[in-house]
Amino acid sequence: MERVKMINVQRLLEAAEFLERRERECEHGYASSFPSMPSPRLQHSKPPRRLSRAQKHSSGSSNTSTANRSTHNELEKNRRAHLRLCLERLKVLIPLGPDCTRHTTLGLLNKAKAHIKKLEEAERKSQHQLENLEREQRFLKWRLEQLQGPQEMERIRMDSIGSTISSDRSDSEREEIEVDVESTEFSHGEVDNISTTSISDIDDHSSLPSIGSDEGYSSASVKLSFTS
């Protein structure tokens, strides 16, 4: 029974060797000249099978490495193109001297680094100056508020004094007008008194000639009536 099993196993091994040999012949493209009976060296089929798998793996690895190499080349090409574009833009942004006609990548990067440091220093100075100006503006605003307080009070006080002076002046002018009116009335009174006094004097004067003669009396009467 065990012998039959060994024979079956041997036949399976021979069939496997035959199939592998056919596969190798198809891969290399030529017919095999081996005899149909296996040789004693080919009775063990596992090492050739391992070699076949290694060859398949090596061929697959070769294809994969070729694909990876082409991908890497494409990426490297794109990277170089992007780097060239960035360098061209950097030439536009960096102030270069007129004598510099040809620039290396290292020299261009060094100039860009120096230019960036210069811009950072200028930005720090501008920020410091801006802070000083803001501080000075706040101080001046506070000082203006301090000065506007007393000035506003002084202005209100001067306005009140000016209004008081103007009111006093108007009162004095009003009193002067009243005094002028009273003086004017008094002048009229004096005129009346003077008229009365003159009339009385005329009467007294006319009474004297009336004592002496009738002609004098009549003339005095005429004068009195004319004066009236």
Swiss-Prot record:
GO molecular function: DNA-binding transcription factor activity, RNA polymerase II-specific; protein dimerization activity; RNA polymerase II cis-regulatory region sequence-specific DNA binding
The keyword Nucleus belongs to this UniProt entry's keyword annotation: yes
Tissue: High levels found in the brain, heart and lung while lower levels are seen in the liver, kidney and skeletal muscle.
Domain of life per record: Eukaryota
GO cellular component, one term: nucleoplasm
General function of this protein: Transcriptional repressor. MXI1 binds with MAX to form a sequence-specific DNA-binding protein complex which recognizes the core sequence 5'-CAC[GA]TG-3'. MXI1 thus antagonizes MYC transcriptional activity by competing for MAX.
Binding partners and assembly: Interacts with SMC3. Efficient DNA binding requires dimerization with another bHLH protein. Binds DNA as a heterodimer with MAX. Interacts with RNF17.
Identification of the protein by name: Max-interacting protein 1
Native source species: Homo sapiens (Human)
